[in-house]
Amino acid sequence: MTLNFSKPIFALAPLAGFTDLPFRSVVKKFGADLTVSEMISSNALAFQNRRTIKMLEKSPLETPYSVQIAGSDQDVIKKAVEFINSKDGIDIIDLNCGCPAPKVVNNLQGSSLLTDLPTMAKTIKSIKKYSNKEFTSVKMRLGFNSKNHIEIAKICEDSGADFIAVHGRTKAGKYKAEVDYEAIGEIKRAISIPVIANGDITTPQKAKWVLEYTKADGIMVGRGAIGKPWIFQLMTNYINGNRETEPTKELIAKVVLEHFDQMIAHFGDYGAIIFRKHLHTYSKGYSGSSKFRDLVNRIDNVKEMRDITKEFFLI
C-alpha cells in the first residue's frame, strides 16, 4: 500500500526510545496509516553501526514505512541514503528538521538546520537525488527562535520534498509552548505539497478540529499515542462519524501483553526493562497504579514481569 492523501492520513510521529518496531506494530493494528522509525543518525547509518541497522527493521504490517534520518554532512547523507536504498520495505526517507535536543542541535542536525536554510535545502536535495524510495519528506518546526515557517516550508517544497510534517512550535518552544495551528494552516495555504499537522493532538475531537482548522492533509500523533496506541482507531472512527468506543479492559490487557511479548522477541530479555516506561503509561488511571509502577521498576525477570502485568491489567 502506498501513501494516499486523498483522505486524511493518520501517522505515528517518531519518538526516540518509544516508537520502536514493537510499538509501531501495535499502532498499525489500530489503523495508523503511516509509521516512522525513531530518529536515526546518518553518521551511524553511513558507518553501518549494528545497533542502528536494527533500528531500520520493520514489522510486516508497516506499509508504508518511513525511516527518519538526522544529519547535514552531504557525504555522510549520501552514504546513509545509499545504505537505506539496499533495504527493502522502506517507502520514505524523512529528514529531521525538528528535534530540539541539545546533542542533536549542536551538530547542525534536527532543528538547528532551520538556522541554515541553504544547508537544509542542500540536504533535502541530496536525499531526493540519491534515494530509490518512493517519497522524500521533512519533519519541521515553525522556526528556531522565531517563526519563519512559510519560508522553511517553501524551501522544503522547492528542494524536492513530497510532503512535510509540521510541528506547530519553534525550537525555542520545545514541547511546552502553545501549538500554533494557525501557522500550520498558513503553510498549507502557501505550498502545494501535502502537509501533516503535528503537536498536542491527543483526542479524537482535537484531531477533527485541527484537520478542519488547518485544512491539513493528515495528523501526526506522538506522545498522545504512548500508553494509548488505540487512539488512531478512536480518531478515524470519530472523524468518519462512527461511534467512538473506548477499548474494553480485556482488549487493553491483550494489547499490553502482546506489546510486552513483541518487546522480548525484538530486544531479548532486556526488553522487559525497556518496557517499564510503557507500563508506566499504560497503567495511568488504574487503581493501584503507583504501587504497580514501583513494583515493575524493581523487576527484570521476564516471566515475573509478564505475570504481574497480566494480573494487574486483568483485575
Predicted regions located by residue number:
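N-terminal small/glycine-rich loop or linker at the start of catalytic domains
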Residues: 1-10, 43-64, 99, 104-109, ...
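Alpha/beta catalytic cores of nucleotide-metabolism and tRNA/nucleoside-modifying enzymes
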Residues: 1-6, 21-22, 130, 145-163, ...
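Glycine-rich, positively charged N-terminal anion/phosphate-binding segment
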Residues: 2, 15-91
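Structural preference for beta-strand elements that scaffold enzyme active sites
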Residues: 9-11, 34-36, 64-68, 91-94, ...
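Conserved, mostly hydrophobic/aromatic
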Residues: 12, 27, 38, 67, ...
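Active-site beta-loop-alpha junctions enriched in small/polar residues
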Residues: 15-17, 40-42, 70-72, 98-100, ...
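Short, charged, surface-exposed secondary-structure boundary motifs
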Residues: 45-48, 174, 228-234
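Alpha/beta enzyme core
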Residues: 78-109, 118-193, 209, 213
